[in-house]
Amino acid sequence: MNPRRKSRFKLVIFVVLGIAIASGLMLYALRQNIDLFYTPSEVIQGKDNNPNQKPEVGQRIRVGGMVVEGTVVRDPKSLKVRFDLNDIGPAITVEYEGILPDLFREGQGIVAQGVLTQSAVLSATEVLAKHDENYVPPELGEKMQKVHKPMGIKAADLKGESERDRQEKEGAK
């Protein structure tokens, strides 16, 4: 190898190594900001019912589901709130300290973002409530469609009000 070719080769190697190191450091720094989306069933059973695809304790995740009625427990001396969240399967417990959104209530859909402290307990840093009665986060909507199709539930049945809502409205009149 002549000296000129050798110096070019060294330059190319250094540039490639520099890009690889910079990319690795950038991915390492952004790793903590990557939040994977799960449903409560996937937190307990794993994605596609594969236990190897369950989130690990200590991992930052986002969980979307419905607040289970009768499970909201507020600490009278602080802003701590504890409630259960489920989809159509098992529920997980969410612990949150802070002011909840105005639209937060039992039986409504939310997305909680935080760290999994136990296999079925999420310590939330943020709780997002849905915008209106028809809003479903895109990730949750896709997951619910996959689950409901095999059960024979049509997409039209998932939108709007339920039979129970209609009965309550008629009873109030």
From Swiss-Prot:
Its membrane topology: Single-pass type II membrane protein
GO molecular function, a single term: metal ion binding
Transmembrane feature ranges: 9-29
Name of one Pfam family that matches: CcmE
Signal peptide annotation: none
Predominant subcellular localization, coarse grouping: membrane
Biased amino acid composition, Basic and acidic residues: 156-173
GO biological process: cytochrome complex assembly
Cytoplasmic topological segments: 1-8
Topological region Periplasmic: 30-173
Keywords assigned: Cell inner membrane, Cell membrane, Cytochrome c-type biogenesis, Heme, Iron, Membrane, Metal-binding, Signal-anchor, Transmembrane, Transmembrane helix
Domain of life where this protein originates: Bacteria
Disordered: region residues: 139-173
Protein residues bound to heme: H131, Y135
Gene Ontology terms: cellular component: plasma membrane
Protein's cellular compartments: Cell inner membrane
Function: Heme chaperone required for the biogenesis of c-type cytochromes. Transiently binds heme delivered by CcmC and transfers the heme to apo-cytochromes in a process facilitated by CcmF and CcmH.
Family: Belongs to the CcmE/CycJ family.
Protein name: Cytochrome c-type biogenesis protein CcmE
Species, as recorded: Haemophilus influenzae (strain PittGG)
Taxonomic placement: Bacteria, Pseudomonadati, Pseudomonadota, Gammaproteobacteria, Pasteurellales
